């Protein structure tokens, strides 16, 4: 889809209106969890596309018209950030933050890591922050770029940054994107990442409730991003612990099945095992 030369939303006189426009979009994205996923990216390619599409419907009427006209672009390009990971080495840290890396001696890492970027850099250095992920700060940066695109009346920029914003917000809602044990590799639970964010939604998303109300204005988008990370991180122990408990109840031949996905037989967690895990989490994946 080409947007060059397309007429963008009317440029209001005050910058604050443009900022509120972006903040409302961010509010909608934070409101919307995921719906379904494939084995790609934080929520899978399909999941990220669905998040962006459904977030559009939470926007107020003055915003909805513009984004509805471009909803296919916003949805299709929701996965661009994941595709860039293969070409841009700076991209990967934008999708996560291993906040538990900063927890020493039982201290609360959220009390140790400053929420403001400049203060965090002063305390830990930028190299350290980049090494362990920067997703909450990158959400703020993308929102700023989106706001500037509105100021310029740059339709291409608006759509580009709005698509990216949805992606990073979605990533911040994944518990395993907030821990060094992101794939269970430290607890002998290899593969739990894709299990949680892909297999469960794949089998259950049709039953999820997608009616989430309207987006609300965010006074402090950086705090909202950090709150999403915090809410994700407090669920890490449950994500890992409940899977260990379910695993102990299932023999290997009931835990996995082989399915033909056009590339020969591929091993997946069984429907029975997946349901047992999802039931134990009491709908966590849908809520996130």
Language-model regions, residue ranges each:
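Functional cores that coordinate and move charged inorganic groups
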Residues: 166-172
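N-terminal, motif-rich segments that launch catalysis or mediate targeting to/interaction with membranes
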Residues: 31-164, 175-288
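Bacterial N-terminal signal peptides
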Residues: 20-33
């Amino acid at each position: 889809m080409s947007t060059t030369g397309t007429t963008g939303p009317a440029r209001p006189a005050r910058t604050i209106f443009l900022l509120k426009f972006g903040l409302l979009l961010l509010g909608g994205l934070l409101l919307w969890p995921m719906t379904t996923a494939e084995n790609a990216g934080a929520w899978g390619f399909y999941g990220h596309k669905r998040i962006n599409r459904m977030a559009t419907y939470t926007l107020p009427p003055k915003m909805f018209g513009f984004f509805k006209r471009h909803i296919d672009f916003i949805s299709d390009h929701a996965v661009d950030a994941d595709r860039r990971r293969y070409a841009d080495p700076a991209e990967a840290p934008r999708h996560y933050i291993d906040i538990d890396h900063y927890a020493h001696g039982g201290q609360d890492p959220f009390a140790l890591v400053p929420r403001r970027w400049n203060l965090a850099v002063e305390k830990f250095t930028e190299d350290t922050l980049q090494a362990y992920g920067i997703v909450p700060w990158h959400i703020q940066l993308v929102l700023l770029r989106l706001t500037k695109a509105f100021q310029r009346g740059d339709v291409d920029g608006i759509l580009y940054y709005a698509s990216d914003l949805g992606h990073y917000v979605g990533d911040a809602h994944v518990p395993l994107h907030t821990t060094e044990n992101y794939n269970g590799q430290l607890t002998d639970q290899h593969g739990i990442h894709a299990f949680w964010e892909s297999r469960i939604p794949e089998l259950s998303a049709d039953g999820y409730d997608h009616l989430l109300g309207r987006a609300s204005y965010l006074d402090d988008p950086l705090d909202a991003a950090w709150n999403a990370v915090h809410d994700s991180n407090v669920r890490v122990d449950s994500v890992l612990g409940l899977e260990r408990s379910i695993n102990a109840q299932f023999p290997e031949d009931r835990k996995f099945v082989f399915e033909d996905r056009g590339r020969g037989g591929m091993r997946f967690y069984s429907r029975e095992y997946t349901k047992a895990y999802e039931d134990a989490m009491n709908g966590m994946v849908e809520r996130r």
